[in-house]
Structures are given as structure tokens and as C-alpha cells.
């Protein structure tokens, strides 16, 4: 299971009839709101509840796929003595991850580099990627987690621009990396702007630890680094069910709480959830 750093609130709206889905950590709740002046019939409420359940199932399935893809790649690195760039690229292509998972924009490997070994690491990495450097080294840092290998779904040059960048330098990402290490499993960040994206699109990054294999079951080896994958929130919420729900409802996504400042996706650019008196009737509640 992915453990989200922040809460997400998701609203589905259609004219006077609206449905609200809360994702709390990975808890999802669907609420249906009834216009008091028009009193929708029970069959309409039931039909909307069924739609909310179907949406919940599809979202759960997609989140599981994101987590599984991230975990599988980290297991591949953990089980290998040394993964070469061509092996990483072949794995991504053979798995068809970008084709199967809409919104997934990139995968990468972030090795753990102790601060005292940066110069040696840069020399070794430079044999694979000439000119490799970890820019903007920080005082008092025990270790860096720079991008070494990576693939981007739409723009291969993006990886070259980011190669060597220390992902732990961004607080929201470092917090998720630390939690992934503690949980020994995939952890997602809060939504934030993608690095060096001209459109400043919002992404969620998922981190899974890469460890040295241990002989005994249940023992955790030393941390060798992290696998990350990034997911654009826009196609995730708009297209993950092939746009079927968008034909019937407006989807609104809030982070942490329902407020204008926390809105991260709105299908029709009209924030129905912020209107006074929106919440009325609870129709469905579930966890994913």
C-alpha cells in the first residue's frame, strides 16, 4: 500500500447532484449531496452510489498498480549486484509501464552516496555519463541521493537535465524517502510542482527503498538507495478510467482539506465543493 503524506479530497459533481470522495492517506470515502429544493429520488441516489463504488474500485486498482510497479523495480535493484544502464532501460521497456499506467511520467534510481564518498562516486558515474556531477552540495548532509539512472515517458532529455540532482534536497521528497525507509515499502509524496517542467504541472512521487539482500527472512539490509516513479495528477484523475466518469460528473480533487488553496484538480474549473451548503447526504464510504 502507498502511504500518502497528505490527504486528498475528491468531488464528483453533476448539476444539482454531487458526489464527494475523500482519500485520507489512502482512505477513500464517497459522499452524495442532494439539492434540498429538488429532492432526488432513491433510485438516482442508488445509481450514483454504484458509480461511486465503481470509481473507488478503479482508483484502488490504479493505485495498487502504481505501488506494485515501484516495488517491483526496487526488488530488481535489491536482488542485483550491479544494474547497468542498459539493463534499467530494458526493464522499463519490457515492462511497458508507461503504456499501461496513464499519468506515470518517469522512473529513476537514486543511489545512496555518503558525503565523504561524493568525489569517488562522481568519478565512477562519469565513466557511464561523462560530466556527471552532484550540484549544489549541502553542508552537514550525511548522504546524497542523486539521480543516476532514469527514463521519462515523453521527454528523454529531461533525465539528462536532472541527472546528478539530489532528490533528498527537496523537503517533501526527503520526508517520503525517510518514511519509505522506515516502512520498507513504497511511500508517496504530497502533490507538488514537477522539476524543470515549463508548465509547472503537479506530480506525486513514489519512493521505494533499495536494500542489500539479507540471508534471513524478515531482516532488512542496509539502505543502498531508492527507486522513484512520478505521476502527473492531471491525467491520473482525468483519464485513469478512460474518461468514463468525466462524461457524467465533474471531478474535483483537494489536498488535505476542501479549500480553494488546496484544489489540485477540477474537471470543469468550477469548484462545486466550495459552494455553501454543498454537503448534505452520506451515500457511500469505503477505504482503498
Residue ranges of each PLM-predicted region?
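Intrinsically disordered, low-complexity polar/acidic regions
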Residues: 45-53, 78-288
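A broad, low-specificity signal for short, low-complexity segments enriched in glycine/proline
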Residues: 16, 30-38, 66-71, 163-170
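Generic detector of bulky aromatic hydrophobic side chains
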Residues: 25-30, 34, 48, 63, ...
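Extreme N-terminal signal-anchor transmembrane helix of membrane signaling/transducer proteins, especially
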Residues: 3-38
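Juxtamembrane membrane-water interface segments immediately C-terminal to a transmembrane helix
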Residues: 35-68, 74, 78-82
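Intrinsically disordered, low-complexity segments enriched in polar/charged residues with Gly/Pro
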Residues: 4, 18-19, 34, 63, ...
